[in-house]
Amino acid sequence: MSKKSLKIITLGDSYVGKTSVFNNFVTGKYEINECTVSPSFYSKTLTIENEPVILNVWDTCSQERFNGLSPIYYRWSNCYTLCFDIHNEKSFKNLDKWMDEARKFCIGKVPFVLIGTKKDIPRTDKSISKERIEQWCKNIEDQGIIDRVHYFETSAKFSQNITESYNAALKLALEHYNKNQKPPITTPAIDSLQEVKPGYCC
């Protein structure tokens, strides 16, 4: 029996900390480094309900610096994580832009997990209030874009809600795959753990 191959991509503005979240999920560590501009790729075989599943996670990193992401990063995605900095107004407002781009290039109704980063930093008057975030989620649900928005506030520095957010994404990705039966994903012939380069800013 062939293994199911699931693809999850990570989206969000530069410097919101999405690469730190990604690296923490992959390595369990938090490291500060210079921002990288090439996407990172991670692949691992998991067993879910006694069935082998290949999980492929793409961190798009700073590809948004160019004229939009290449459609290749979106192709055959089963779920995406949408990241913003809970202390950065612009990154919150740009969630709609990222979601629109994902909906444009992804095939079918692809689910997503909303991730707020830098939970370890105390909120101030300039931070995004939980009420605004809840309202954004409600608006998305009311529009029928997704039945339920799964939202997690995370801290890569202290490994808070990292595993939980990606477990939710994995569950949604598997449900999407089972409904759509996508063809296998072509992935680079690399050792994915070596390809992941810990970084802070993207």
Swiss-Prot record:
SUPFAM superfamilies: P-loop containing nucleoside triphosphate hydrolases (SSF52540). SMART domains: RAB (SM00175), RAN (SM00176), RAS (SM00173), RHO (SM00174). It is found in: Cell membrane. GO terms for molecular function: GTP binding; GTPase activity. One of its GO terms (cellular component) is plasma membrane. PROSITE patterns: RAB. The keyword GTP-binding applies. Keywords: Cell membrane, GTP-binding, Lipoprotein, Membrane, Nucleotide-binding, Prenylation. The keyword GTP-binding applies. It comes from the Eukaryota. It is a lipid-anchor. A motif (Effector region) lies at residues 34-41. Belongs to the small GTPase superfamily. Rab family. This is Ras-related protein RabM. It comes from Dictyostelium discoideum (Social amoeba).
